[in-house]
């Protein structure tokens, strides 16, 4: 056996003995389930020429993008890390440098999938897979939102005013190269004295599994409480919906959507919360805080919720990918720590 291959085999065995998380993931999730949706968009069915380098396998490319999002890596960084890390190459089934896509290929494929809305389709595909595993409970849902930071723009005051008024699309038409680097969809906002720029991920999760069931992406200035109805589905009817104090006074909206509001109360000037209200809030928060675990995982294990791209279309694709990657890893956690939640398919 070649000495380098022998060394790699020993490294793989050592990683496995230590509990390689990507190996555990591969054993549980068959990424081939995503092939139909990926081939639909990426395979050039009318390409008859055999010249040039053959296309990379579509599932391989998605797994590269999956790794990139989970570890919060840029296009150049993911190429380097695949070359450098045995665990990445094992997960991808790659053995030689020639099999590794370069940064331009990664960007190109991700761009095609983003524009086509493919990450939404893959999220739905995996959600159906989870439903098939019995991970669909009707005991309550939780809604919350988190900022998705975007690259900050340097504009004049007049340009910012036009963007804020919704007329930013007409700016820089005489400078197309400059315009392609300008984000006219992202917005500034302030929360608890801290400024944020970019977008916002609004998510609905199941209270029992902490799996994300639906998500909506808006600019950062949209208040959390204005995105309730788009997240609620018919199957949620009659279930309790847990919300924090930021959704105060939205009881009627929740009821109109067919759910039972369970909203933490907020004290006001000259009207502080009573001891009873504080106790009620503590009880509600025991369930509501479970959604914080989701955003905590994204911020911690996935190196934050952010976009490196320009515009709402790519931001929506990025949040769809984030939610999909989170759900896949959450499914692995459930298998490991809460296997009783998974219904027997036998």
Regions found by a protein language model. Give the residues of each.
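Helix-centered, glycine/charged polyanion-binding patches within enzymatic domains
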Residues: 164-166, 240, 245-320
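Polybasic low-complexity intrinsically disordered regions
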Residues: 80-83, 93, 101-255
């Amino acid at each position: 056996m070649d000495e380098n291959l022998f060394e790699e085999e020993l490294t793989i065995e050592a990683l496995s003995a230590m509990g390689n998380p990507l190996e555990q993931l591969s054993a549980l999730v068959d990424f081939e389930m995503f092939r139909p949706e990926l081939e639909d968009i990426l395979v050039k069915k009318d390409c008859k020429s055999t010249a040039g380098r053959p296309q990379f396998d579509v599932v391989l490319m998605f797994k590269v993008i999956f790794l990139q999002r989970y570890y919060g890596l840029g296009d150049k960084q993911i190429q380097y890390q695949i070359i450098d890390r045995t665990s990445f190459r094992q997960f991808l089934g790659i053995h030689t440098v020639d099999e590794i896509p370069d940064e331009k290929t990664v960007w190109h494929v991700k761009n095609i999938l983003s524009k086509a809305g493919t990450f939404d389709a893959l999220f739905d595909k995996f959600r159906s897979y989870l439903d098939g595993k019995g991970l669909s409970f009707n005991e309550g849902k939780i809604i919350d939102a988190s900022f998705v930071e975007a690259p900050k723009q340097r504009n004049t005051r007049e340009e910012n005013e036009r963007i804020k008024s919704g007329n930013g699309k007409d700016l820089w038409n005489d400078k197309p190269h400059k315009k392609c680097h300008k984000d006219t969809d992202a917005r500034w906002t302030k929360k608890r004295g801290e400024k944020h720029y970019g977008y916002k991920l609004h998510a609905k999760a199941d209270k029992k599994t902490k799996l994300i069931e639906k998500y909506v992406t808006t600019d950062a200035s949209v208040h959390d409480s204005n995105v309730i109805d788009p997240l609620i589905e018919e199957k949620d009817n009659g279930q309790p919906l847990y919300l924090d104090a930021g959704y105060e006074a939205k009881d009627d909206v929740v009821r109109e959507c067919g759910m039972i509001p369970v909203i933490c109360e907020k004290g006001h000037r000259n009207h502080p919360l009573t001891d009873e209200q504080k106790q009620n809030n503590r009880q509600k928060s025991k369930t509501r805080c479970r959604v914080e675990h989701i955003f905590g995982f994204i911020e911690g294990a996935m190196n934050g919720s952010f976009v490196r791209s320009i515009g709402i279309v790519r931001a929506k694709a990025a949040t769809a990918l984030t939610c999909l990657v989170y759900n896949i890893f959450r499914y692995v956690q459930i298998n490991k720590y809460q296997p009783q939640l998974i219904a027997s398919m036998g």
